[in-house]
């Protein structure tokens, strides 16, 4: 099939996208030795195939460099490296071992495993800890990957596998009921996992600090990690300082680590600038029992002339409004003035119907996706659960013009 159709595919792809400014390189393929069941990366067969495809791309667009993703631990990539303009390596550390005069980058990296809001391996429920300490055998933790590429003088950077969890490849469980991946920086609902904040601390210049885990436990010593881009951080438990740490003391995993004897109450992380001014703060409270549901929306108004969807987040809260981080209450959604498209909770081993109106919360949260009915007025979404106060939210509907804005 490939031999018969590659020219057609290359032509249609480039003609479709060559005016798209987001396209910076053309890739000849990913892990082509595996996907085409060819020989070793140094074989004449695979070199000839890639040379032919590269020539086809260059004939259509010589203005952009070509690249490809290669997975060849210990393999001979010199012949393939000579074909493309920019060399992509899947996994394999920081690429220091590959000899080439071409630009080099991580075309697929990491494959770290985590479940949002879980802080110990839970084999019964097929959930991985949200501490950045688990990866597949061929991959690395997120922090290991970031550190490798930051320390490399040769690499242009790396692409992470993956931004989002996705349905399929529930590595390493690989059996029912696990049905989606655990690789994501965010889960299938789009809810950030803790590792999201590690990346934020590395790449965002806006002051930030993030505590993990939550602060609702039974007892024991708790490993507390802080992700922050501030010059120094300080952790407090119930008003008592547990010590200040400077940026130079940041661990190799891109976080500040404390071991804290658990006591119910409040844990606070402060971030300071170089002059000692407080510029960022995160707080975790000990939660009580679930008491109510609270809804929030990704938008306050929806254009009825569009096919826009509205994403409704449901949080399970205690009577004081604190998120109950281990809550798993079954939540039922209803909507007036619209239609439920689906529900989810982001857990890779949850097999409730995604197109249904009911979902159990996972780590205190679940999601409902709704679509307007085309009429003006308001769309009202309600969430109910046994024994809890219902949550409601309204989204305005109408033919509105949404002004385009530049990213912040």
Name every feature range the model reports, one short phrase each.
Residues 229, 235-242, 281-283, 309, ...:
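Short flexible loop/turn segments that cap and initiate beta-strands
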Residues 246-247, 290-295, 334-350, 401-406:
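Short aromatic-acidic-glycine turn motif
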């Amino acid at each position: 099939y490939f031999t018969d159709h590659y020219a057609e595919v290359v032509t249609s792809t480039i003609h479709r996208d060559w005016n798209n400014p987001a396209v910076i390189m053309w890739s000849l393929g990913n892990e082509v030795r595996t996907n085409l069941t060819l020989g070793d990366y140094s074989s004449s067969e695979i070199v000839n195939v890639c040379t032919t495809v590269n020539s086809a791309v260059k004939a259509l667009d010589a203005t952009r460099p070509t690249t490809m993703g290669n997975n060849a631990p210990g393999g001979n990539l010199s012949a393939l490296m000579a074909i493309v303009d920019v060399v992509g390596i899947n996994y394999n550390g920081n690429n220091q071992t590959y000899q080439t005069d071409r630009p080099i980058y991580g075309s697929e990296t990491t494959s770290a495993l985590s479940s949002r809001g879980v802080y110990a391996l839970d084999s019964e429920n097929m959930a991985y800890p949200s501490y950045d300490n688990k990866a597949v055998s061929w991959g690395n933790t997120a922090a290991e990957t970031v550190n490798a590429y930051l320390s490399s003088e040769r690499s242009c950077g790396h692409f992470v596998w993956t931004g989002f969890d996705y349905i399929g490849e529930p590595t390493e469980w690989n059996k029912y009921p696990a049905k989606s991946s655990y690789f994501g920086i965010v889960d299938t609902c789009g809810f950030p996992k803790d590792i999201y904040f590690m990346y934020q601390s590395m790449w965002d210049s806006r002051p930030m600090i993030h505590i993990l885990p939550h602060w609702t436990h039974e007892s024991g010593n708790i490993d507390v990690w802080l992700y922050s881009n501030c010059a120094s951080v300080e952790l407090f438990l119930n008003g008592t300082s547990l010590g200040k740490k400077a940026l130079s003391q940041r661990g190799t995993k891109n976080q500040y680590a404390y071991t804290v004897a658990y006591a119910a109450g409040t844990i606070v992380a402060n971030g300071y600038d170089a002059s000692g001014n407080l510029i960022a703060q995160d707080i975790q409270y000990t939660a009580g029992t679930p008491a109510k549901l609270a809804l929030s929306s990704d938008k306050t108004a929806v254009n009825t002339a569009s096919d826009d969807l509205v994403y409704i987040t449901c949080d399970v809260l205690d009577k004081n409004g604190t998120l109950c981080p281990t809550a798993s209450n079954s939540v039922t959604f209803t909507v007036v003035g619209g239609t439920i498209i689906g529900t989810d909770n982001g857990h890779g081993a949850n097999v409730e119907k995604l197109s249904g109106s009911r979902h159990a919360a996972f780590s205190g949260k679940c999601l409902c996706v709704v679509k307007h009915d085309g009429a003006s007025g308001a769309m009202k979404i309600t969430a109910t659960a046994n024994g809890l106060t219902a949550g409601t939210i309204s989204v305005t509907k109408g033919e509105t013009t949404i002004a385009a804005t530049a990213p912040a």
